[in-house]
A protein has these predicted regions:
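Periplasmic N-terminal accessory/gating domains of Gram-negative outer-membrane beta-barrel systems
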Residues: 76, 112-167, 171-208, 219, ...
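Transmembrane beta-barrel wall of Gram-negative outer-membrane proteins
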Residues: 240-263, 277-312, 330-356, 409-415, ...
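Membrane-embedded beta-barrel scaffold of Gram-negative outer-membrane proteins
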Residues: 353-357, 361-365, 489, 497, ...
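Gram-negative outer-membrane beta-barrel transporters
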Residues: 457-458, 567-652, 749
């Protein structure tokens, strides 16, 4: 017995001597102690957990080389090789926070996101179609956000002192030419595409990604839907027309196809809303589209979208140079657009996105000088009357091929690179009053390569760094455009962002061809943003400065054609923008407020000096409020848009100085417009609904406030006429049905 006790004590003493203490402290990269970190010697049972001070301690009988592991959710796993001998081991360990999508800062300087799933979303997809002043038009909805101008006489997005041609629109990465219906004098046309085609929208008012180019001011980036939730059909009837479509999802939910057709005839709409123009051809539109989508075995997606539209309109308006003559303008348009894309994951962090697009656009435009009996008049003297009789035929073809390769690195870090090739051929035939014809063709081959990296240093600090190189046949020169954005997130989850970039653009088609040697126009963007977002509120303030160089100057030929002559133009735009959205303060009420201050001047085209352009206002603001009353099954939406007066000018040629000078100038009245809409959902609350029905009533400019967009001058500059909307207000009534899918909850959530 004595021997056994002695042996037992010897073993205890040996074990005590053989144990080695391992201790230390674990902190994050900022020195903050981490509680609950699990520490173990790999492939053993020895280990411990840190206390509230980050300290740990354990003993081990292991000897030799081992790997110490430390792990905690939200941080990168830590490993360190150490040698266990006789002496205690003391360690001070610092581990890095794991960069995750839910916690990471969002690089957002210059951009607004509209998506139901994106955590940085400011507007959802349904917001776009329920904003009263937008009339279910994608671009019009973004006019309630800061940075955009309230230009009512011309289509397009006028952003931060830039013209509409300085904003480009992309669908699934490919540039969309003729996104809007063809222009008509003094009337802004709307976009061609249904907003429900898109699952995501990014509106960048500056500093946009190196993946896109040829836009001096902004980019609107649209991403089309993938597979539908289920098979469904839609039907709509309104005062402007009728339309319907179907989306069919396969039984295995791996593919779908869809078609739609819309017919618009504004006879009834114009009967309700009297127009100031005398329409001899009521606007008529035929529009059809088709799509298919296929999910690949590896989870990728192939998407095709095809669109065709044909439309025509014609109207008479008083001629400003005469008290008895009229101008009869007419236009017929045929537009075809096709886009196919393939997105695929190849494993090992590689992703490929490719796209092909092809489109054609044909415009037949005619203008006649007519008398009181609507008979054509050809007046040779004075000569400017003669040029009011003309015909113009435009034929354009566009094609684009594009690919982007993404390589995912550790965490959220990604590097991407790619290239695109863009082909355009635009032919114009101009026929004068005497039958003389002038035909011009402009062909361009634009090639670009680009690269961009998302670098997440921590969850709180990230950068997007990239660049783009382009070569255009028209300019016959290369350009290099660096882009960089940096964002930092504070402890209260607010964040600050900075963006810088160079942006280049070719001259507009209407100023080509030219015999002059020309270069790209260029703009440098500097953007500083502060933003705080919660589930219920969004606040952001953004300051920007934009410097224009090498803007095009133009001159007019004896036939009245304006062409680019040099790149001596320049300009600047600077300002401050505010945005606030609140879904919390008032029960069941969602509202947002935006404000923009803009200081801009430029010398370009035929401007005689550096002046504020006629499409810019110093102050713009918008207020949108929405409330859904479940008891009444009704949603109420109101928007108010405001802008201070815009400048207008009359340029006349001074023979003594051999240049244009300002003959007259002024400012329009302030722009005010309140719009209202009501959505009634009669099926709300019913069970086993197979049909989702919405009645819509919308009124633009409810109060009938006077609006003046600009002024037109007669040839001598002695008379001017205000450019005003076609009607004081517009009343829209429609009924929309969806068969096979219930969107009631979407409609409710959108208004809560």
């Amino acid at each position: 017995m004595k021997y056994v006790v002695s042996l037992f004590l010897s073993v205890l003493m040996f074990s005590a001597r053989a144990q080695v203490k391992v201790s230390g402290k674990i902190t994050d990269t900022k020195g903050k102690p981490l509680y609950g970190v699990s520490i173990t010697l790999k492939d053993t049972y020895d280990g411990a957990t840190t206390d509230s001070s980050g300290n740990f301690s354990f003993e081990t009988t292991e000897k030799g080389k081992h790997v110490l592991e430390a792990s905690i959710i939200g941080y990168r796993p830590f490993e360190q090789e150490l040698t266990v001998a006789k002496d205690p081991i003391s360690l001070n360990i610092s581990i890095k926070e794991l960069v995750t999508e839910l916690k990471a800062v969002v690089i957002s300087a210059g951009s607004f996101v509209a998506s139901d799933k994106n955590k940085g979303a400011v507007l959802s997809a349904l917001d776009i179609v329920t904003t009263p002043s937008a009339n279910a038009d994608v671009t019009s909805a973004f006019k309630t956000l800061p940075g955009t101008q309230q230009v009512g006489e011309s289509e397009g997005l006028f952003v931060r002192g830039g013209s509409a041609t300085e904003s480009k629109i992309y669908m699934d990465g490919n540039l969309v030419n003729n996104f809007f219906y063809s222009s008509t004098p003094g009337i802004a046309t709307r976009g061609r595409f249904n907003p429900f085609l898109f699952k995501g929208t990014i509106f960048s008012s500056g500093g946009y990604s190196a993946l896109y180019g040829q836009a001096l001011s902004s980019a609107l980036i649209l991403e089309s839907n993938d597979l539908p939730e289920r098979t469904q059909a839609d039907l709509g009837v309104s005062v402007i027309g009728i339309g319907g479509g179907i989306q069919h999802l396969s039984k295995d939910k791996k593919s779908s196809w869809g078609v739609s057709y819309n017919y618009a005839n504004l006879w009834l709409g114009f009967a309700i809303n009297k127009q100031k123009q005398d329409f001899f051809q009521i606007p008529v539109y035929h529009q059809g589209d088709a799509n298919f989508r296929i999910r690949t075995k590896s989870g990728g997606m192939i998407k095709y979208y095809g669109y065709i539209s044909a439309n025509k309109t014609g109207f008479r308006s008083a001629d400003i140079d005469s008290t008895v003559l009229k101008n009869a303008f007419s236009i017929e348009n045929l537009n075809i657009y096709q886009n196919i894309n393939w997105r695929e994951n190849f494993g090992m962090g590689w992703k490929l996105t490719t796209g092909l697009s092809y489109s054609t656009n044909k415009d037949d435009i005619s203008n006649e000088l007519q008398d009181a009996n609507n008979q054509k008049q050809v007046i040779i003297n004075p000569s400017f009357f003669a040029f009011k009789n003309f015909k113009l035929r435009n034929n354009a073809q566009y094609a684009q091929a594009r690919f982007v390769l993404d390589k995912k690195l550790n965490g959220l870090n990604v590097v991407r690179f790619g290239s695109d090739y863009f082909y355009s051929k635009e032919k114009s035939t101009y026929t004068l009053f005497d039958g003389s014809r002038f035909a011009e063709t402009v062909t361009d081959n634009l090639f670009s390569v680009f690269t961009e990296a998302d670098v997440f240093i921590t969850n709180n600090l990230a950068a997007k760094i990239g660049g783009r190189v382009e070569h255009s046949q028209v300019v016959d020169k290369w350009n290099i455009a660096p882009r960089v954005s940096v964002a930092y997130k504070f402890k209260d989850n607010s964040q600050a962002s900075f963006a810088y970039g160079l942006f280049y653009q070719n001259p507009e088609r209407k100023y080509l061809p030219t015999v002059a040697s020309i270069d790209y126009s260029r703009a440098a963007h500097y953007i500083l943003q502060y933003q705080k977002m919660t589930n219920a509120r969004t606040f952001r303030v953004e300051a920007f400065y934009k410097k224009y160089t090498d803007l095009y100057k133009t001159s007019v030929s004896p036939t009245g054609r304006e062409a680019a002559t040099n790149n001596n133009g320049f300009g600047h735009a600077q300002g401050l923008e505010l945005f606030f959205r609140d879904k919390k303060t008032f029960k069941n009420v969602d509202y947002w407020i935006s404000y923009s201050y803009l200081d801009t001047k430029r010398d370009y085209l035929d401007y005689p000096t550096s002046i504020m352009p006629s499409f810019a206002a110093n102050h713009t603001a918008a207020f949108v409020v929405k409330k859904f009353v479940t008891k009444w099954k009704t949603g109420f939406n109101m928007s108010y848009n405001f802008a201070t007066g815009r400048p207008y000018y009359y340029f006349k040629y001074d023979n003594a100085q051999s240049k244009y000078v300002i003959g007259d100038a002024g400012k329009t009245i302030n722009y005010n417009s309140m719009s209202f809409s009501v959505n009634y959902l009669p099926n709300l609350g019913k069970t086993n609904k197979k049909t989702f029905l919405v009645w819509v009533l919308g009124i633009n400019n409810v109060l009938g406030q006077n609006q003046v967009f600009n002024y037109n001058y007669n040839n001598a500059g002695t008379k001017k006429e205000a450019v005003t909307p076609p009607s004081k207000r517009f009343v829209f009534i429609g009924c929309f049905l969806s068969f096979g899918i219930d969107r009631t909850q979407d409609a409710i959530n959108n208004n809560l």
